[in-house]
Amino acid sequence: MEKQTLLVTGGAGYIGSHTVVELLAAGHDVVILDDFSNSSPQVVDRIAEIAGRRPALVEGDSGNRDTLRRLLAQYPVDATIHFAGFKAVGESVAKPLAYYGNNVSGTVVLLECLEEAGARRLVFSSSATVYGDPASVPIREDFPTGPTNPYGRTKWHIEHMLNDLAVASPQWSIGILRYFNPVGAHASGRIGENPRGIPNNLMPFVTQVAVGKRPKLSVFGGDYPTHDGTGVRDYIHVVDLALGHLAALEKVVAGKGAWTVNLGTGKGYSVLDFVKAFEKASGKPIPYQIVDRRPGDVAQCYADPSLAAEMLGWRAQRDLQQMCADSWNWQQKNPDGY
């Protein structure tokens, strides 16, 4: 693939920052658009430090028409990777309008501006939450969708919108990536997951328990129909996920139309499997307590990743032990985040 100028919305976020590092390493020019509502400006310095060159940065909201028009007039964007969005399941249940407004309405504005600028190549961050509670696992892309919470429904609406757009306007080329559960951190320990306040995701919560920031891990639900009663998920290393975006970008640049693939490892681990792996990686005990299930959570969710291998030539390489080791390295080097 020739060198591209890439707009990365939410490029200072957890998955976005790791992807920007890989895009820069592959020789592309990157423009990050981020309002830092859930990330830190320091991330951009860390990205530059790892990659040896700096992405351009526009501070602003990816759903703001004026910001987007200015950016697209200034930079010759070849393709866009759209990460920006609110992403906490529990918060989406409490604040559905904020989620529909930011995620769905914001994406409509982004697409209108890209259409206007003739920048009709897009890779979209979707989520395995669109599958809801699957009838069986592993989950294939042709399984029925039925998200069980507003966050998942925002992703589901955007997927439909992108498919409708590709039908109406055949010059669009769109890759939809359904992520499973990203964990881990860059091997340098310079960028990683840095949640504000109480973490919603398992890994940062576990790392905070390991360093004594939190007394114990709350495990939501011990009565699921799984091998140990705790929820089973497909954890994928964030660097593998970032490389999946590079593979998706190649396909988007080369083709037309819309397509959807899962990005997961194909292996399901329970919360307690995860805790054991982290204890091994860190040498620290992780005290935990089983509490009530969380609304909107499903029993088990892991990918059939074969379509991504076939279509994109991409496979996850890093195992759970590596994910835990890299997260522990990040936590030790950055006890207070950025």
Residue positions per predicted region:
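Short, contiguous strand/loop micro-motifs
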Residues: T5-L7, L97-A98, P134, N149, ...
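Short-chain dehydrogenase/reductase
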Residues: Y100, T148-W156, G192-N200, P204, ...
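N-terminal Rossmann-like NAD(P)+-binding domain of SDR-like oxidoreductases, especially those catalyzing
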Residues: M1-A185
